[in-house]
Amino acid sequence: MIISRGSHVDEEPVAKKPRISVGEMTDDTTDDGLNTEEIRAPYTTEEMDEPEKAALLPKIPKKSPVSIGMNPENGKYVLPNYSKDESLNARKFLKYYGLRKFLDTYLPEELNSLYIYSLIKLLGFEIRDKELLSSLYRFFHPVKSSDQFKLEYEDFTDPLEKKEAVKLIKDLQKAINRVLATRIRLSNFYTIDHFVSKIKKAERILVLTGAGVSTSLGIPDFRSSEGFYSKIQHLGLDDPQDVFNYDIFMQDPSVFYNIAHMILPPENMYSPLHSFIKMLQDKGKLLRNYTQNIDNLESYAGIDPEKLVQCHGSFATASCVTCHWQIPGEKIFSNIRSMELPLCPYCYQKRREYFPNTGDEEYDTLKGNLESGIQNNNFALKSYGVLKPDITFFGEALPSKFHKTIREDIMKCDLLICIGTSLKVAPVSEIVNMIPAYVPQVLINKDPVKHAEFDIELLGFCDDVATVVAQKCEWDIPHKDWEGKLKKKRFDVNEIERGVFNIEAGSPE
């Protein structure tokens, strides 16, 4: 049994290279309909200088890197041992030259399924099917450094069954799609000095922010052990994220308004990190700030509306879910603090027809009627005339501004800085994989983001890292704490591994 040039299996004596259909088994289309394949950026650009291009270009192998020999003494096969550099080069080759040339270069013309498995390993992956893995290793010879025997590289029969070979082809498809969808770190951008030099020269910086930029103000993040979702587990919801589920809100808005006070943002406050972004704007360097936060603190810091994309909406405004009348968000803050349903004045009389015994202060009665409505399946009544903050719930589309700007911005930016985010929610989390490969990417976060490949990771409190960067750039952050507390504050900066630094406040002199 052999692997044919298509994805099916033939009973012929010689195998040919498989035709892999990239995208057939991929997750590139996000939940919000943003197809990263359609807007994937070029690998290099003519604007790059030669050292920058050289850092991205792969080496062309002198011979087929994937070669499998057989030990004639026991009939078992020997897999090559691939180094990290060989794996990195294979990934670069695939991304730069494309799939067809990659397969032509890395696989011999005649092959069997063991070559497919070896190529998966070369790309840095392992198959998860334990049964298939067990079948494979029955045919491999464990090689020790002291072993000396001559291998045969002539054609040999594929040891795997047809269904196992098909599984391997599908796993190779997944590995290829993952490589194409994930960036590769730049080899010439890995120190803080590199970052400082780049941020000084950059003219179109894309900043992506998450909850970590606001935690210093007492606003909880969402997914950490001390975050918001952990604090509401006592509510007994199947999923803590249900408090932001649009369908559940429409069925029973009290689920959200029982906890909304916990995430209500402070007014007219912002962190040094917010001011750091404002500083980039003032210096003409900020292309756009895409924030996943709903606290609207960027506006308090002075980020211009045209420079700000609130990907998940914000508390800045609130709208009636029935007639869509909109008001400034602070108009319902008192209701939120009192855990009351804010009601639209234009829909109020009609709502009283549905709930005739409900006064403004009779929240318990209203809640009881809402629960009764749920039991009776009268979904149109429960949220009738309720004002909802204009934050994007699960089940709602992202604001149109996100889609209008992101396609242009990812092609324009010359530096990406991700700050205070775990990059867990699509499609915003996909931005890092859509940026051109030659654009440096920097993470500023308390914890590493293991599923992304940043060139430089600055781990610590966001305000501390922003202060260190500003100090090294000899820039002043426009924040009330800068002159008195931050400008001369000392920090300990330790390199954990190449490109990864831990930053902590140092001991006072």
Curated annotation (Swiss-Prot):
Cofactor note: Binds 1 zinc ion per subunit.
Cofactors that this protein relies on: Zn(2+)
Xref: PANTHER family: NAD-DEPENDENT PROTEIN DEACETYLASE SIRTUIN-1 (PTHR11085:SF9), NAD-DEPENDENT PROTEIN DEACYLASE SIRTUIN-5, MITOCHONDRIAL-RELATED (PTHR11085)
GO molecular function list: histone deacetylase activity; histone H4K16 deacetylase activity, NAD-dependent; metal ion binding; NAD+ binding
Compartments, record wording: Nucleus
EC number of this enzyme: 2.3.1.286
Catalytic activity: N(6)-acetyl-L-lysyl-[protein] + NAD(+) + H2O = 2''-O-acetyl-ADP-D-ribose + nicotinamide + L-lysyl-[protein]
Lineage of the organism: Eukaryota, Fungi, Dikarya, Ascomycota, Saccharomycotina
GO (cellular component) term, any one: Set3 complex
Region (Disordered): 1-35
Family recorded in the similarity comment: Belongs to the sirtuin family. Class I subfamily.
Binding site for Zn(2+): C320, C323, C344, C347
InterPro entries reported for this sequence: DHS-like_NAD/FAD-binding_dom, NAD-dep_histone_deAcase_SIR2_N, NAD-dep_sirtuin_deacylases, Sirtuin, Sirtuin_cat_small_dom_sf, Ssirtuin_cat_dom
Function: NAD-dependent deacetylase. Heterochromatin component that silences transcription at silent mating loci, telomeres and the ribosomal DNA, and that also suppresses recombination in the rDNA and extends replicative life span. It acts as a NAD-dependent histone deacetylase, which deacetylates 'Lys-9' and 'Lys-14' of Histone H3 and 'Lys-16' of Histone H4.
Biased composition (Acidic residues): 25-35
GO biological process: negative regulation of meiotic nuclear division; negative regulation of mitotic recombination; regulation of thiamine biosynthetic process; silent mating-type cassette heterochromatin formation
Domain Deacetylase sirtuin-type span(s) in chain numbering: 185-476
Protein name: NAD-dependent histone deacetylase SIR2
SUPFAM superfamilies registered for this protein in UniProt: DHS-like NAD/FAD-binding domain
Pfam families assigned: DUF592, SIR2
Highest taxon, organism lineage: Eukaryota
Gene3D superfamilies xref list: 1.20.120.1710, SIR2/SIRT2 'Small Domain (3.30.1600.10), TPP-binding domain (3.40.50.1220)
Active-site residues, as the UniProt record annotates them: H312 (proton acceptor)
Keywords attached to this entry: Metal-binding, NAD, Nucleus, Repressor, Transcription, Transcription regulation, Transferase, Zinc
Binding locations of NAD(+): 210-229, 292-295, 420-422, 445-447, 462
